[in-house]
Amino acid sequence: MPIEILTIPCLNDNYAFLVHDTATGQTALIDVPEAAPILKVLAERTWQLSEVWITHHHADHVQGLGDILSAHPAQVRGAARDAHRLPALDVELRDGESFDFAGHKVDVMDVSGHTVGHIAYYCADAKAVFTADSLMALGCGRLFEGTADQMWDSLSKLAALPSETQVYSGHEYTAANARFALTIDPHNPDLISRSEGITAARAAAKPTVPSTLATEAATNPFLRAADPAIRAHLNMQHASDSEVFAEIRARKDAF
């Protein structure tokens, strides 16, 4: 494989990701919840970190950066609009821009909602999008700063990527998300089957990240605001998609 992606558990339920180009040896890190497990994998693989891509400013996604940079003097990328509350950036990124990583195009997507200024990184060559706390496995991030309309727009942008795209989200929340999803979409056979698989995976201490956009489109209630069965279940047949999404998000907040 020209691109290898490793999922690294951090803290209690965070994930960091290493993206390694096998042809050039270049390695990028997406988010830095803590340094120790990331440094361990880099040492085991004898990889030298060349870049760090930050998704948003929350401490559990950036707090290990200083220790990482002490061991690996990598270039740090992040959102220009969030630069005032991120660690020092070498490259400031804006929505719609792209950059080169080891000969692979990486697209920058503003996915505000969880925070304002949250970005995702999409690499078509890797068939991967790194969404952190925007689109999550069977869920989406809580709206700490943005509005429901903003998050719905962000999720809609992500959902428009190719269906085979692997979704690398920032937390292992999937089992709890599945329990909630079944209260919104209880008769969805794909969701029921996926929920059973998640239970088995977690019992075996296996990660449920990544998923695919096709899987999320079929099972994630936060992407399915237009679905007639969900609208009927919520008695919101005549509401807008963003209104249905907002109701689902409100119910999740209280779940």
UniProtKB/Swiss-Prot annotation:
InterPro entries: Clx_II_MBL (IPR035680), Glyoxalase_II_hydrolase (IPR050110), HAGH_C (IPR032282), Hydroxyacylglutathione_Hdrlase (IPR017782), Metallo-B-lactamas (IPR001279), RibonucZ/Hydroxyglut_hydro (IPR036866). Binds 2 Zn(2+) ions per subunit. Its EC number is 3.1.2.6. Pathway: Secondary metabolite metabolism; methylglyoxal degradation; (R)-lactate from methylglyoxal: step 2/2. Gene3D superfamilies: Ribonuclease Z/Hydroxyacylglutathione hydrolase-like. Keywords: Hydrolase, Metal-binding, Zinc. GO terms for molecular function: hydroxyacylglutathione hydrolase activity; metal ion binding. It catalyses: an S-(2-hydroxyacyl)glutathione + H2O = a 2-hydroxy carboxylate + glutathione + H(+). GO terms for biological process: methylglyoxal catabolic process to D-lactate via S-lactoyl-glutathione. Zn(2+) 2 binds at residues 60-61, 133, 171. Its cofactor is Zn(2+). Zn(2+) 1 binds at residues 56, 58, 114, 133. It holds the Pfam family Lactamase_B. It is an enzyme of class 3 (hydrolase). The keyword Acetylation does not apply. Monomer. HAMAP family: Glyoxalase_2. Thiolesterase that catalyzes the hydrolysis of S-D-lactoyl-glutathione to form glutathione and D-lactic acid. This is Hydroxyacylglutathione hydrolase.
